[in-house]
């Protein structure tokens, strides 16, 4: 049965995505549990990770309001896209994420202007990145045709 699925590219891709989703869910299970029970996202309250949520919210608000790249409210004024490029502003996943958030904001009235929204968004995006990483890694290792190394 597995061989039958494996020989058809669409079914193989579906199986790889399904396995990647399951593995990612197992990987992020403890983080989801901590978030649900304690309200902690990935680590603690003083983590640098918490800096990224306001940065994401700031970028989202500027991109959706179609403001220019220079903003006087960013520190002493500056190019926020260049300054936040290391974090998010040039990531293709960020653009897709912001597009989906904007669509959800317009259709089902989610509130991305509240900082608590971005904690949930961080968990979802971390899960999505993990699934994508598993899929790309599988295809990369298949392309490289790695053979098992002898133990001794």
Q: Which role does the model predict for each range below?
A:
Residues 10-11, 113-117, 144-148:
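Membrane-interfacial loop-to-helix junctions in multi-pass inner-membrane proteins
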Residues 1-34:
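Start-transfer (signal-anchor) and selected internal transmembrane alpha helices
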Residues 18, 127, 134, 149-151:
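Hydrophobic transmembrane helix bundles of membrane-integrated enzymes that assemble
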Residues 24-134:
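Membrane-interface coil-to-helix junctions
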Residues 137-152:
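Transmembrane-helix signature of polytopic, membrane-embedded enzymes
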């Amino acid at each position: 049965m597995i061989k039958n699925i494996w020989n058809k590219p669409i079914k193989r891709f579906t199986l790889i995505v399904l396995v990647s989703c399951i593995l990612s869910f197992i990987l992020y299970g403890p983080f989801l549990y901590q978030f649900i029970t304690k309200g902690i996202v990935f680590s603690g309250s003083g983590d640098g990770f918490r800096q990224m949520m306001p940065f994401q919210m700031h970028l989202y608000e500027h991109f959706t309001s179609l403001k220019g790249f220079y903003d006087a409210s960013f520190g002493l004024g500056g190019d926020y896209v260049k300054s936040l490029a290391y974090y998010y502003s040039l990531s293709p996943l960020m653009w897709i994420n912001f597009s989906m958030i904007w669509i959800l904001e317009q259709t089902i009235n989610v509130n991305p202007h509240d900082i608590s929204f971005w904690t949930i968004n961080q968990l979802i995006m971390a899960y999505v990145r993990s699934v994508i990483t598993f899929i790309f890694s599988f295809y990369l290792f298949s392309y490289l045709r790695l053979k098992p190394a002898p133990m001794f």
